[in-house]
Amino acid sequence: MVAEDAAGIGTNKIGALAALGYDYAELLLCGLAKLPEEAFWQVQNELTQSGLRCEACNGFFPTDFRLTGPDIKKDQIREYIARALDRAGALGVERVVFGSGPAKSVPSGFPVSEGWKQVAEMLHDAGEIARQYQILIAIEPLRRQESNFINTYQEGCRLAKDVAHPNVKSLVDFYHLVEEQ
């Protein structure tokens, strides 16, 4: 689906997807999270009227967010996660994909091991919030052209194991898997 709406969410395609017989829509969570309340409820109404569910969301974090490095803002991250997952919960989302390449990339000169700890802690906190909505967070390893961090399925599995939260797992995207071989 190519998003043509102002927020880049793809809501302009909901009616067409329903008419074509699609089972569900996968929307951009960072776009949903930044919508004003009224615009968000319009998205929910469009989904309801179309009969289409939003079972999954991609784009957990916006590209300008920093999840690793010396200047992360933990309070801002927690507030964002709470808002984003609240929105996902209101739509009945079951899975949120954490690829978020630019947001998770480790800044040059910053220890990767420290970035790993930061992301693991953040995902554990996110898992606690996700549990309230019965949402599963799926770690998506991305090819190196999109991020310098969590690039292989093995790394995604290791991160999920380190997070040790039942609402945080790893997924494999065939495209990224093949690109990293």
Q: For the regions a protein language model found, what residue spans apply to each?
A:
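N-terminal pre-domain/capping segments
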Residues: 1-93, 124, 161, 165
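Acidic/histidine-rich catalytic cores of soluble enzymes
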Residues: 24-25, 57, 120-181
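Active-site groove signature of glycoside hydrolases
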Residues: 90-109, 133-143
